[in-house]
Amino acid sequence: MATPSNKNSKSHKRNRRGHIGLNVPNIVLDQTTGEYRVSHRVSPSGVYNGKQVIDKK
């Protein structure tokens, strides 16, 4: 197994891992129901882009 020949400092380690992080979900206000939902997803009522795509039972 490969091992580093020299010690990796905290700054080098953190610079390498800089792209790893939490992403904040893009939350928008649904115009049909008035509730918040994640964008580009079907709302809990089954409406997407102003059209009923899933029949709610």
From Swiss-Prot:
Pfam families: Ribosomal_L32p. Residues 9-19 have a biased composition (Basic residues). GO terms for biological process: translation. Residues 1-25 are annotated as: Disordered. GO terms for molecular function: structural constituent of ribosome. The keyword Chloroplast does not apply. SUPFAM superfamilies: Zn-binding ribosomal proteins (SSF57829). One of its GO terms (cellular component) is large ribosomal subunit. Keywords: Ribonucleoprotein, Ribosomal protein. Belongs to the bacterial ribosomal protein bL32 family. This is Large ribosomal subunit protein bL32. It comes from Leuconostoc mesenteroides subsp. mesenteroides (strain ATCC 8293 / DSM 20343 / BCRC 11652 / CCM 1803 / JCM 6124 / NCDO 523 / NBRC 100496 / NCIMB 8023 / NCTC 12954 / NRRL B-1118 / 37Y).
